[in-house]
């Protein structure tokens, strides 16, 4: 049988079929093809010794139809049946928040403004990434943002709507983290600074800080070094966290699958911004995001090390061939290779003494760093690291309570 993190990786890589005995439409959250499309799966919670593991399981993609993993339901609840050996893993299907079906004061369904992915709120605040509008399109080949905006979510978000949804997520779902993201908006063109993603996020960050509270993260296309004042302005407005999707360490894979990013700032531009914000905000406040399963595994490991060396922590997404992307027919990654990647992730975080898993933020779209400890044989050093993280979680509780309160930036 698999341990919880191994099962999580299996579910990400193989997807899952849903048995006729299940009533997920009534019992669970709706499938949310928002933002880049990674939330296209069914949200599950896997029991684990330290805390439940959230996972957004692929169920609609083509590869999931052949999965040996099947969600079943009986009188005791839900479970995942592995048809290869007959093992059944109990799981929980979290119910959909009541606020998903309510309307904002402007009449928009709240779930078209933002959705929970784990216990955090994700909001795409701007219109579609402009790489989709170039001719020929220069969008990342694995992304579906340009096809989701305006169909599965509002194409442009009203500030008041976002605040109302963030309040509902805080008060009714216990969310402590709001994550705002945008795509490319001519960040390499100085005279178009007013439409840069960071500038578009600024009023949302300020309003959420002053009226909602909690932790606020921003993911936007990096600006060149001469415009790093845009990061300073967002920090002043109340941003706590920045994430940078540089996607691939292998230069050939990066250029082939991320043509827009390669032709504008390139990989180095992402790292310059990552290093700058990591120095401004401190350890644990900046992440570099990389995709595992499309480039050589050793390149992904080097990318993890490079992110750590930049003063950030690595967020590793397992490649999902989402419907509507150029790569929708590509095979998903091998789970064994992914276990190798995430074992390396744990060792890199441990060796750098990164404060992972300190805040009560659960992300269902990725295998979180703190979950990967069970992929590595315990040593005295890893136990010491675990003890330190446990102590930090206790120390952080008053800070989390303070951050949850709205305040002027």
Regions found by a protein language model. Give the residues of each.
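Short acidic/His/Gly/Ser-rich catalytic and metal-binding motifs that mark active-site loops
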Residues: 133, 250-255, 323-326
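Active-site-proximal loop/turn and secondary-structure-junction residues that shape catalytic pockets
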Residues: 125-129, 184-186, 222-226, 248-250, ...
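Catalytic alpha/beta core domains of metabolic enzymes, predominantly
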Residues: 270-294, 303
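Hydrophobic positions in alpha-helices of CheY-like receiver
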Residues: 204-208, 274-277, 281, 307, ...
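Catalytic cores of alpha/beta
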Residues: 225-236, 292-310, 368
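Auxiliary Fe-S-binding modules of radical SAM enzymes
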Residues: 1-82, 280, 301-409
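Core AdoMet radical
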Residues: 144-164, 169-230, 234-273, 285-287, ...
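N-terminal [4Fe-4S]-dependent radical SAM core
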Residues: 54-141, 145-155, 403-409
């Amino acid at each position: 049988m698999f341990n919880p993190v191994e099962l999580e990786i299996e579910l990400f890589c193989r997807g899952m079929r849903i048995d006729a005995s299940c009533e997920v439409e009534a019992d669970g959250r709706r499938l949310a093809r928002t933002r880049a499309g990674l939330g296209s799966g069914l949200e599950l919670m896997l029991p684990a010794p330290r805390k439940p593991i959230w996972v957004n399981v692929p169920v609609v993609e083509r590869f999931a139809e052949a999965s040996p993993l099947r969600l079943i339901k009986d009188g005791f609840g839900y479970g995942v049946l592995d048809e290869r050996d007959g093992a059944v893993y109990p799981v929980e299907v979290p119910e959909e928040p009541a606020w998903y079906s309510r309307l904002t004061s402007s009449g928009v369904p709240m779930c078209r403004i933002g959705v929970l992915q784990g216990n955090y709120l994700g909001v795409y605040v701007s219109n579609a990434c402009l790489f989709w509008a170039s001719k020929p399109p220069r969008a990342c080949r694995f992304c579906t943002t340009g096809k989701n905006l305006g169909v599965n979510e509002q194409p442009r978000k009203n500030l008041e709507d976002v605040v109302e949804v963030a309040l509902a997520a805080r008060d009714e779902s216990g969310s402590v983290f709001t994550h705002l993201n945008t795509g490319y908006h001519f960040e390499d063109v100085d005279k178009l600074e007013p439409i840069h993603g960071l500038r578009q996020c600024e009023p949302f960050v300020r309003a959420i800080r002053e009226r909602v509270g909690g932790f606020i993260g921003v993911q936007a296309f990096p600006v060149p070094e001469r415009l790093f004042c845009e990061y300073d302005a967002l920090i002043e407005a109340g941003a706590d966290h920045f994430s940078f999707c540089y996607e691939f360490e292998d230069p050939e894979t990066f250029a082939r699958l991320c043509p827009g990013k390669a032709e504008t700032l390139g990989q180095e531009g992402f790292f310059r911004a990552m290093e700058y914000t990591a120095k401004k905000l401190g350890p644990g406040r900046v992440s570099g995001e990389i995709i595992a399963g499309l480039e050589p595994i050793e390149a992904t490991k080097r990318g993890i090390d490079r992110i750590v060396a930049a003063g950030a922590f690595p967020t590793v997404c397992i490649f999902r061939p989402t419907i509507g992307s150029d790569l929708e027919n590509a095979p998903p990654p091998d789970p064994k290779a992914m276990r190798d990647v995430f074992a390396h992730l744990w060792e890199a975080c441990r060796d750098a003494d990164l404060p992972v898993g300190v805040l009560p933020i659960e992300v269902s779209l990725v295998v979180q760093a703190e979950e990967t400890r069970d992929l590595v044989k315990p040593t005295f050093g890893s136990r010491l690291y675990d003890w330190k993280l446990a102590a930090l979680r206790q120390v952080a509780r008053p800070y989390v309570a303070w951050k949850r309160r709205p305040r002027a930036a």
